[in-house]
Structures are given as C-alpha cells and as structure tokens.
C-alpha cells in the first residue's frame, strides 16, 4: 500500500473527528481525565481464589465518556474480531467458543486508542447464542480497555491498588430517585417543535370547525335547519358529561311539555303560532342581521311575547316568561313507609295501610327471651363481672342440677373404664360399683339419715367382695 493510500485510509478512519480543541477545552479535558473516580463508580465481584475484584461497569464508562467528551465528541469502532477456538462436543452437541475483539475509540481532535477484549463461553447449547455472548462480551471489554487509556476518570484508576484500598473504605452516597430527570413523552424539550406547529394550525382554524363548543360561545347566525343538522353531525364530539346532561334535560323538558299541553292546550297553540311566525321572520332576515346566535344547553328558554297584533312591528317584553309552569309537589301520593307482612297480606293490594299496622324495627318482641343484665338495644361487649354473680347464684339455688352433672361425669368415666381390656376387668367392675354407690351417696346428700344408710350399704358391699376375692 502506497503512502497516499495510507493517508486516505487514515482520513476515512478519522471521519469528521479532525477538529482541534481550544485552549479552554483542552484544559477542561486534562483536569477531568486526571481525577480519579468516586466510590459510586466502583463495582466489585468475587474473583479467582476468593479475592474481590474491582471494576467499572460498561454503562458507567459510557456515561463518563459522554459527560467528559460530549455525546458527539467521541466514537468507537470495531477493528477486528478473531475466533481463537470453537470446539463442539460430539456426544451432546455443546459448543465452547473463545474470540478476541479489537475496538478503537476516537475523540474530537482525531486522537484515538485501541485495545483488545476477550469473550468466551463453555458448553453452550447452540452456536448462535455462543457467538452472541462472546462478541458482546469481547466488544464491551475492549471498549472499556480502550477508554481507560485516556485517563483515570475513564477507568485507569482501577489498576491502582492503593487507590482501591482507600476507596473501599468510603461509603457510596445513597441513590435518590428523581422523577424530574425522567425522559417522558410529554417532555417540553422533545415536543417543542410539534407544539409550535400545532399552535400555527390552531390559529388558522375557524370557530365552526372546533370539535367542542363551550357554553356561551358565540357563533355566526345560521338557519334553524342548518343548526339542527350541525348538532346531529357533531354529537359524537361532545364530552360524555355534556351528553349525559343533554339527555336528562331533554327528558325533563319533554315531561313538562306533555304536562303543559294537557293543562293549557289553547295557550300552547297560540304560542306555537307566534313562535312559528317569529322563526319565519328570522329566516328571512338572517342574512341581514348582525347579532350573533348563542348556543346553549337545552334548558327552558324565555320566549318574547308580542304586544302588537302586527308581526312585522312586533315589540318584545323585557320581563322573561317561561314556557311552562314550575313543578308543584304532588300531595296526593302517600309517602313510602314500612309495614309488616301480615298487614300487607291483610291490605289485599290496597296502597294505604292503617297506621297501627306500620312496621316498627325497634319493637321488642315479648316472645323472644332476653337476658336482663344485657342491653339488647346496643352492640356492646359483655363483661365477665356482670355474668359471674348470676352463675354463682344459680349454682347455689339448684344443687340437684349439680348432682346430675356429677352423675353424668361419673357415668362417662365408668364407660371409659369398662372399655379398657381384660386385664383390668375386676378393677373396672369394682370401680363401676363404687361409682354407682358414690352417686347414690351424692344423690342423697341432702338427707343425713339416708346418707348414713347409703354409707353402710357401701361398706357391706365392699366387705362381701373382699371375702369372695
């Protein structure tokens, strides 16, 4: 290759990066590149032999390069990729691959640094995933090694053991998430040009082309038919809340109109004739009139009344008059109330039931037994102190019930003893007889004489069994 060809290749490699730095830029870069990194940029992982290895992550290295050189002040290019080995296991088809990558980093004035990176993988299932992993790993390694040649702030300080010893004692600052630093779709800086275009387009629009019309907005005069057609065409562009209000108001007005027609049919006919003549006059003079028409919601509108008989010289009153009379409460319908099921069955479809049969949800029924020590009108916890005196009093006044409880417990114990087995048959029999005698003794504990007789019978029975044994 001749000298001219080498210069041509060198110029192509440099690209547009052939602008010399100014004195201020050079001093800034020199001071920035000589400083060492803080603890927030240093990462650690376990290395061979159980030792800790300090390194800088690839995204932090790229962020530092953009901060020091500028986002358009440096570039990287892959110079070569060499596959060192690729072994395939014939038994399971696993791939072991290793390759080296050379990356060049060029800055604004044309200066560049190259370095080598390596990527490897063992026992990978496929060739594609093996090459993908190795090429990415080798390129990232080569990029970081090329950037560290520019100075300490781009990773060269990671090879200083004394620096790593001291920076390892420092605590990195806590990370505080700031949502204001996020790049959002509504970012003003990113949408500035689009907003300017939208403003120019909105300024050229006419009022009639607006999709939404606010209340009280003035429009040019139109004929009634055209206005109705436009409302039907633009009904889909109204907001949901506005449509809901329109439909509700129309239903109310229709109900009022029916009530008004039934109440005053003659007056409605007179008003309709005058309104028709006024609309015709407005249609004839709509092109010559300069007063704008206001679009509003479908509320009851005040209609002017003509004081003269002639239609052309009609004069309207200043006092507004509504089309319909105000609503009056219907006093004939009874108010809703609760009644019992028995009263409803006795009414047999009659709406009005007698007042005595009204349902009272707070009525205390005498058929339901309730404890006197508890207030059933409120939901409160029951205190133990209020219940214990009642239990003690009942236990003192009813000894028979206590005896019955004792007898029940004795019978349960005897049943358990009888089911033990053959070894304890004599003992279970003895226990059963003694238990019955004890129960008899307890049953007659209220009478002293009967208690003595029961005791004598018990002793005699025990003596007989002892002699037989």
Swiss-Prot record:
Its main location: nucleus. Residues 287-296, 431-452 have a biased composition (Polar residues). One of its GO terms (biological process) is gene conversion at mating-type locus. Residues 265-296, 429-469 are annotated as: Disordered. Keywords: DNA damage, DNA recombination, DNA repair, Nucleus, Phosphoprotein. InterPro entries: DNA_recomb/repair_Rad52 (IPR004585), Rad52_fam (IPR041247), Rad52_Rad59_Rad22 (IPR007232), Rad52_Rad59_Rad22_sf (IPR042525). One of its GO terms (cellular component) is chromatin. Pfam families: Rad52_Rad22 (PF04098). SUPFAM superfamilies: dsRNA-binding domain-like. Residues 453-469 have a biased composition (Basic and acidic residues). The modification Phosphoserine is found at residues 296, 319. It is found in: Nucleus. GO terms for molecular function: damaged DNA binding; DNA end binding; double-stranded DNA binding; identical protein binding; protein-macromolecule adaptor activity; single-stranded DNA binding. Active in the repair of DNA damage and in mating-type switching. Probably involved in the repair of DNA double-strands breaks. Has a role in promoting S phase completion. Belongs to the RAD52 family. Interacts with rhp51. This is DNA repair and recombination protein rad22. It comes from Schizosaccharomyces pombe (strain 972 / ATCC 24843).
